[in-house]
Amino acid sequence: MKKERYEIVAEYLECTATASASTANLGPGYDVFGLGLDVLQDTVSIRIERKTIANKNNVKIIMKGDMGKSIPNDLDSNSAGKVAKKIISDYNLYNYNCLIEIRKNIPPGYGMGSSAASAVATAVSLNALFGLNIDDTKLLDYSAEGELASAGVKHFDNIAGSFFGNFVIVKTYPNLEFIRIESPNNLTMVICVPLIPVPKMKTEFSRKVIPQQVPLEKMVHNVANACSVV
């Protein structure tokens, strides 16, 4: 990409994006099904300012809101930070100071795609600010970098639900692909958030206890159940 495509002449630019909560798996659709929710949103505001000397320590994160108090603001432990770090590295955007302010409204650790929402809003904001013209598939791939902070691996189900809304099927082989299905107008979701503390990195721990191999019979049952959902 040529530098002039994302050259910024103003003293600073700012962009704000919101991304919705989501739920994923929906029973048999592990890492495949995502569903956008309209109950809560994270808001990410990013301000970039041109500087004369390149510096790789050019990103600062500020967490706001009660839901953000337990979330670290260092880049490698924050989903928005992971996304920003990857995009800035890939496009060599070290000549800009980048301030990321996250208004966290989605409770982390309760299966509502809290990390995914912040990651999606960050990717969308950076794409707009720098005029990178990243397509949707690649934008979601960047957003999934944020899941490394909470899950230890890239997965796309919550990311897709937050980005596209409605019901989304994720295909990762042979290429990353998303199939969006409009949800019925009369579909109602009941969200219950238990008032109990959850451990840090809960998602990463939960994924580690899932068996790596399952009997063929169980796989067939699961595929049938997944097809029934669709």
Language-model segment annotations:
Residues D135-V230:
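ATP-dependent small-molecule kinase catalytic core of the GHMP/sugar-kinase superfamily
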Residues Y110-S114, K171-Y173:
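Short, conserved acidic/polar surface loops in the N-terminal third of protein domains
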Residues K2-Y110, A128, L132-D136:
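ATP-binding N-lobe of GHMP and related small-molecule kinases
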Residues I53-M63, M112, R180, M201-K208:
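Short, charged, solvent-exposed linker or helix-capping segments at domain edges/interfaces
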Residues D76-S79, S114, S118-A119, H221-N225:
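Catalytic-loop motifs flanking and including active-site residues across diverse enzymes
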Residues G81, K85, A119, A123-N127, ...:
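Residues within alpha-helical segments
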Residues M112-D136, F163-G165:
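DPxDG-like acidic metal-binding loop motif
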